[in-house]
């Protein structure tokens, strides 16, 4: 029956039972108060007389600790050894052990006596102690590439149970393979406290890649969480296999810049002195790895090298290119030309690489420079030429002014939207901007001037038919043009609501009709004269006139029209 109870208890309370034991287990912490429960608090039966705690001594014999009478508040401590000042009882009858130590790892029994029964409940106590933080000691000063060397010893102290140590490289666990990695661990116990210390020694075969590797030691313990030592890096010694030359100056290199050449070798410790080959000339530098060219010119472009002091064959080469850009533009500044003249624009350039040229006119980008073989007013403006290569840019500009005497290109009229005014529009070309003079008074509506083209508008109220002149002038000449303007009042009488253009159109139609009548009369007269002459010829010869009655009738009608 006892074995069945143990098996059942193992299933329902596995977390509290020690492996291989049927007793519930309590985990206490070293140096702190350990609470040992009495039947998990179910210890107050009816008719309770007293509760007693006892323990199993090292030799297996029982030892009394204390007794608590049900009718009394304070317990009676019966222990005579080290527990005398360390034990007490809680309100729920749990045993309290102050300043827990490894000597408390034993079995404690709670005896509950009532008027009808006597029960005992045993609990096994285990004491855990978190280890000290891991520390790597006896560290090697440097590791040699490819050689098995003891890197260091990791130590943790004062733990229970003993801690496990794991070596890590770059947060990856190292595994003992018996060749390139060998790990040896030892555990020792303090004879007084019984606490354990663990040490682990790592022998490691380094590689060049381990120069930046970080080695740590991790302590794993049941009290958790894991503790990690301070990361350590180690110097790895290996010979130089490759030399590299770098140009550390900003790119691109321009004339006037300072250029720094830096020579590096992959050996460790790295070499500190080098030979620099400056366009065929050897220059030795000691205790540094750089050489500086000051104020370079395009002549400094070429091949540069560096090598070890004791091995000229192991070298590195770099090509240095000094960028330059020479450019000039003709013309520049202010350029004054006449309308229709020719302007030749010349851009000269010389550079270390392909040149990019962009043109803008009045801040607007141009696909290409316009054709200036015959200048127009619209060609005037501020032209900017940007010439550039990577890292270098030059800008040139010229401001072109195209001048010409004024010329009127159009003079028109129309009635205003409200029908109460006449609006005259005079359009002219010229530069400088022409000034306008009208032969009649009116209101200047608006004036615009764009690309040598000027537009002037005048609003008038003609009370009679007028001939209006538009005169435009500038310092280079003048031009004038006339236009007929009819009175608004006369136009309103015959055809109210019609505009002046409609009146003019009616006059044209009347003229055309009259012209057609006159042409018809003229044709009839000519035809009549022709018939008359023909008849006279017939009378002279005595020949009878031939023709149908319809033709005769048509001739008489035409003659009649001609007489009219």
UniProtKB/Swiss-Prot annotation:
Q: Which InterPro entries match?
A: CD80_C2-set, Ig-like_dom, Ig-like_dom_sf, Ig-like_fold, Ig/MHC_CS, Ig_sub, Ig_sub2, Ig_V-set
Segments on the Extracellular face: 25-507
Any ranges marked Cytoplasmic in the topology annotation, and which?
Answer: 529-564
Q: Name one GO biological process term.
A: adaptive immune response
Q: Where in the cell is it found?
A: Cell membrane; Cell projection, Axon; Cell projection, Dendrite
Spans annotated as Disordered: 539-564
Residue positions the entry lists as glycosylated: 92, 350, 441, 465
Name the residue ranges with Basic and acidic residues bias.
541-564
- One example GO MF annotation: identical protein binding
Instruction: State one Pfam family annotation.
Output: Ig_3
Signal peptide region: 1-24
The Ig-like V-type domain sits at 25-127, 131-229
Write down the superkingdom of origin: Eukaryota
Reported tissue expression: Expressed during axonogenesis in a subset of developing sensory and motor neurons that fasciculate with each other in the central nervous system. Expressed in the retinotectal system of both embryos and adults, with expression in all retinal ganglion cells (RGC) during embryogenesis but only some RGCs in adults (at protein level).
What is the protein's membrane topology class? Single-pass type I membrane protein
Keywords, in A-Z order = Adaptive immunity, Cell adhesion, Cell membrane, Cell projection, Developmental protein, Disulfide bond, Glycoprotein, Immunity, Immunoglobulin domain, Membrane, Repeat, Signal, Transmembrane, Transmembrane helix
The transmembrane residues are: 508-528
Listed disulfide bonds for this chain?
38-110, 154-217, 263-306, 426-470
What is its biological role? Cell adhesion molecule that mediates both heterotypic cell-cell contacts via its interaction with CD6, as well as homotypic cell-cell contacts. Promotes T-cell activation and proliferation via its interactions with CD6. Contributes to the formation and maturation of the immunological synapse via its interactions with CD6. Mediates homotypic interactions with cells that express ALCAM. Mediates attachment of dendritic cells onto endothelial cells via homotypic interaction. Inhibits endothelial cell migration and promotes endothelial tube formation via homotypic interactions.
Q: PANTHER family this protein is in?
A: CD166 ANTIGEN, CELL SURFACE GLYCOPROTEIN MUC18-RELATED
Domain remark in the UniProt entry: The CD6 binding site is located in the N-terminal Ig-like domain.
- Subunit composition and interactions: Homodimer. Interacts (via extracellular domain) with CD6 (via extracellular domain). Homodimerization and interaction with CD6 involve the same region and cannot occur simultaneously. The affinity for CD6 is much higher than the affinity for self-association.
What protein is this chain from? CD166 antigen homolog A
Q: Which organism is it from?
A: Danio rerio
